[in-house]
């Protein structure tokens, strides 16, 4: 397979995942902005700041920077080194771990997806300004996650070496 096709597949994997994060952050940012524009009490401002700091640490640093982003970058490198049609066409899904992954990773990805859907359904029922306060923290986490993903992808691509295991089973044909 041509080198440029493999490189494009790896780029599609990382950029596709980053695009989903950016899209979600922009969608949620409108709710956070609505809450701030409507005016917050001092207690609500305090909770907004505490939530943003907590989500930066929990979602951004621990979730994305230490786990998700390096793994997505490692799997994008795997797309480049071991391309298949499925991996190239569906590179963002492969890089996120939805297929061609260890049983543990697939289980964690699907459980994580279900929990995100549940959180979205629950957050939709929360009135303003509380929804905006919650969404502001998620936006901070997603922003951190996007930046950490781009940094991890660049470092992995530059070194041509994954920073963490790609968590691909030994006999993965997809």
Please place each PLM-identified region on the residue numbering.
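Hydrophobic alpha-helical transmembrane segments and immediately flanking/interface helices
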Residues: 103-141
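Cytosolic-side membrane-entry/anchor segment at the start of a transmembrane helix
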Residues: 1-31, 142-173
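Alpha-helical membrane-embedding segments
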Residues: 72-83, 101-118, 165-174
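Juxtamembrane loop-transmembrane helix junctions in multi-pass integral membrane proteins
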Residues: 1-7, 35-42, 129
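Hydrophobic alpha-helical transmembrane segments of multi-pass integral membrane proteins
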Residues: 13-25, 49-57, 94, 106-122
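Juxtamembrane "helix-exit" motif on the non-cytosolic side of transmembrane helices
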Residues: 25-35, 60-65, 121-131
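Membrane-proximal soluble regions of multi-pass membrane proteins
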Residues: 60-102
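Hydrophobic alpha-helical membrane-embedded segments
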Residues: 36-74, 148
């Amino acid at each position: 397979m041509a080198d440029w096709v493999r490189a494009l597949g790896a780029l599609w994997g990382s950029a596709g995942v980053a695009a989903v994060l950016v899209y979600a952050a922009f969608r949620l940012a409108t709710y956070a902005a609505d809450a701030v524009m409507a005016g917050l009490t001092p207690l609500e401002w305090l909770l907004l700041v505490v939530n943003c700091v907590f989500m930066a640490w929990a979602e951004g640093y621990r979730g994305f920077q230490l786990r998700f982003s390096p793994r997505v970058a490692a799997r994008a490198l795997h797309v480049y080194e071991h391309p298949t049609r499925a991996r190239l066409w569906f590179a963002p899904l492969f890089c996120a771990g939805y297929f061609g992954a260890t049983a543990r990773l697939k289980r964690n990805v699907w459980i994580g997806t279900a929990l995100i859907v549940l959180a979205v359904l629950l957050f939709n029922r929360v009135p303003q300004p509380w929804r905006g306060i919650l969404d502001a923290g998620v936006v901070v986490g997603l922003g951190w996650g996007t930046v950490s993903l781009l940094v991890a992808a660049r470092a992995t691509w530059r070194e041509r070496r994954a920073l963490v295991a790609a968590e691909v089973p030994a006999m993965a044909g997809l």
